[in-house]
């Protein structure tokens, strides 16, 4: 595996390459004209540099992992097949990423310690995973994405105030949401095609107001008693009509690290299932 560290002083060393494995761009940045022959990066392209505008070489069509971890004001990745677009680090609050309307790859947030960049295009994406976020009480909004043609997962984060998906309408794969922060807003989400695992402690009128169908099994936690009441005070699924598999209401839900199926915790405060009043069919 070849690793090329590209500063302006050594960029001519990779002018003749059409295919390389990993390309790390730091410090002074990248002159894409010097990479005009580049067609494929089989491994990872890492950008940790600043620029007002950066468009990847026109001949580059295939890229396995693209890591963006510092502020480029406008980053154009249109026309490139990328398996994973990963946002990490800080300095992305003023970044705009320009992509195709249908992005077939996966978007992941991994050790993101600043704001999520703005997106242009990206009406549909292949998958979306939100890992650890070091936002120290900040919020994250992903506004453009309307459809995820695969799985969505949000792993446990306790240092985030809110997660907002104002435009998301459909997830065709599995939907996994694990955390204990106070605001999750999916106001336009109507359909989940696969399984839904939802382990959250707070609901409000913007959490899942329009979720109508889950294609396979659905599990969510209702809260439990352990030296006081824990978990959600209210559960809200006002539009849920159909669950294609098993519907499981569990006092304490699973985590990314364990199932929590046989903990012995009980819910002694839930008095009715009025939050499922629109439900018409299960299984």
Where in this protein do the model-derived segments appear?
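Concave beta-strand-loop units of leucine-rich repeat
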Residues: 1-11, 17-37, 42-118, 124-141, ...
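Substrate-binding/specificity loop regions of serine endopeptidase catalytic domains
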Residues: 145
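A contiguous, well-structured "functional interface" segment within a domain
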Residues: 212
């Amino acid at each position: 595996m070849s690793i090329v560290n590209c500063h302006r002083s050594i960029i001519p060393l990779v002018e003749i390459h059409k295919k390389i494995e990993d390309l790390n761009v730091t410090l002074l940045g990248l002159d894409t004209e010097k990479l005009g022959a580049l067609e494929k990066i089989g491994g990872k392209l890492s950008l940790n540099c600043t620029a007002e505008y950066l468009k990847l070489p026109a001949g580059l069509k295939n890229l396995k992992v693209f890591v963006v971890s510092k502020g480029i004001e406008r980053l154009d990745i249109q026309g490139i097949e990328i398996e994973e677009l990963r946002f990490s680090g800080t300095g992305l609050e003023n970044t705009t990423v320009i992509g195709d309307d249908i992005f077939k790859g996966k978007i992941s947030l991994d050790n993101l310690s600043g704001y999520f960049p703005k997106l242009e295009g990206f009406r549909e994406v292949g998958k979306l995973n939100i890992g650890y976020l070091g936002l120290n009480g900040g919020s994250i909004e992903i506004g453009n994405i309307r459809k995820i043609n695969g799985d969505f997962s949000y792993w446990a984060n306790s240092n985030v105030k809110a997660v907002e998906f104002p435009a998301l309408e459909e997830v065709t794969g599995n939907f996994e949401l694990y955390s204990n922060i106070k605001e999750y807003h999916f106001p336009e989400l109507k359909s989940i095609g696969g399984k839904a695992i939802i382990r959250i402690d707070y609901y409000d009128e913007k959490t899942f107001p329009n979720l109508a169908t889950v294609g396979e099994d659905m599990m969510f936690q209702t809260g439990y008693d352990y030296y006081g009441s824990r978990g959600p005070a209210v559960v809200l699924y006002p539009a849920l009509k159909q669950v294609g598999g098993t519907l499981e209401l569990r006092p304490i839900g699973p985590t990314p690290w364990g199932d929590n199926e046989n903990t012995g915790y009980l819910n002694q405060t839930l008095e009715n299932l009025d939050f499922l009043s629109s439900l018409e069919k299960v299984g």
